[in-house]
């Protein structure tokens, strides 16, 4: 059980867990100075909510076979479809060893100015979390990705531009031997073109890289 009490004077909330957390979690702000300048470092851990009311998931064999559900959007030409994914939960998704079988995959469409992936949770995946391939102007915003195999937020061909990747949290990316060679040293965010917007994203727990600029 989690309870939250807000102090009437300071307006600061106090969060209480029953039972208590099993491990110690430090949260604070550290300050460092060299005598002339002072810098601060945020040491608060990120928290992401995985549960949603609408759930899309693989079946009971997905985890053992690394063969989960997937969503692929493909259509011929600019603005030829609209894909709007908002506040849904995707679990046991993606298929290892199968090219193009990612949890959420926008594939060779061109401009998709009315499409977005927003507020979703994508976790326990077997082949990335989201993939942008040959698309422009897609918004990926305020999502949580956890325990994904391979580069998690993935821009594929270095031809994708004007996409907005904003406010996402990626935690515990895992190495994969079923994808590219670079997926053995994975990144939370795999970035292949400078003409995309990355802002206010956070990552933690990757065995190698947070943001990999492959340009």
Sequence positions of predicted segments:
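Beta-strand/loop edge motif enriched in small/polar residues
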Residues: 2-215
């Amino acid at each position: 059980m989690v309870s939250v009490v807000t102090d009437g004077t300071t307006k600061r909330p106090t969060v209480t867990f029953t039972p208590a957390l099993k491990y110690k979690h430090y949260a604070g702000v550290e300050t460092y100075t060299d005598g002339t300048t002072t810098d601060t470092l945020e040491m608060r851990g990120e928290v992401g909510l995985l549960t949603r009311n609408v759930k899309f998931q693989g079946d009971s064999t997905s985890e053992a076979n690394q063969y989960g559900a997937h969503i692929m959007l493909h259509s011929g030409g600019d603005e030829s479809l609209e894909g709007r994914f908002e506040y849904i939960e995707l679990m046991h998704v993606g298929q290892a060893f199968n090219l193009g079988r990612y949890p959420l995959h926008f594939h060779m469409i061109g401009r998709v100015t009315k499409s977005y992936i927003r507020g979703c949770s994508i976790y326990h995946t077997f082949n990335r979390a989201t993939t942008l391939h040959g698309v422009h102007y897609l918004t990926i915003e305020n999502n949580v990705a956890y325990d994904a195999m391979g580069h998690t937020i993935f821009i594929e061909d270095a031809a994708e531009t004007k996409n907005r990747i904003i406010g996402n949290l990626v935690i515990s990316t895992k190495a994969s031997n079923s994808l590219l060679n670079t997926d053995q040293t994975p990144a939370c965010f795999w970035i292949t073109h400078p003409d995309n917007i990355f802002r206010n994203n956070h990552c933690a727990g990757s065995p190698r890289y947070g943001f990999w600029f492959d340009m």
